[in-house]
Amino acid sequence: MAALRFGPPPAELPAVPPSCPPGRWLCGTAGGSGGGPGAAPAPLASLPPAAEGAPSAQRRKRTSFTAAQLETLELVFQDTMYPDIYLRERLADATQIPESRIQVWFQNRRAKSRRQRGPPRPGAPAPPPPPPQRSPCGAAPLLRAREEHREWPPRAAGPPGSALRPHGGSGGAPAGPYPPRPAFPLPAGGGFSELGTEWEENAIGAFRAL
């Protein structure tokens, strides 16, 4: 009846568990001998409390800029969007802001500027290229060809005496549309024969005087 009321007798616990040192297992037992039902369990090692807010602790602290610092950074950004390390160091000395934070500020400012401009429109027409300038040497042959076209047909060059001979044709009419003009007026009454006779007489008279 006692066994049915109180259950089966408890099994004997091992003297020394394999995973626990004997000193800690036997600590606090009655009489310091053997582990029995009255043996006090060893206190468990306390774990460190879980760190609350670990991601927020690892997050970098946000830098707050004053109005004067923002004005200085904006002036430099209007001048150059990609400052080098030397310019960032000078800005760090002037604004008392770490150089790494200045570099991050310029990265964010460039991204903001691209968002404000928006993507380029694909259908926007490109500006036409400027017209090519013609060199003066290229215009000279064109002007020369125009002058030759105006004087067409060109006048034929001949010996000086050809201007005195009339062109052949019916009724003594000139053959071309541009008859040559005589170099000097012809003497009336056959002046050529009279001049030749007078010259011969003068020459004969001078020869006889010798």
Curated annotation (Swiss-Prot):
Family: Belongs to the paired homeobox family.
Cell compartments where the protein resides: Nucleus
Species of origin: Gallus gallus
Name of the featured protein: Homeobox protein MIXL1
Keyword set includes Transcription: yes
Low complexity bias (residue ranges): 39-57
Sequence ranges of Basic and acidic residues compositional bias: 144-153
Residue spans of biased composition, Basic residues class: 109-118
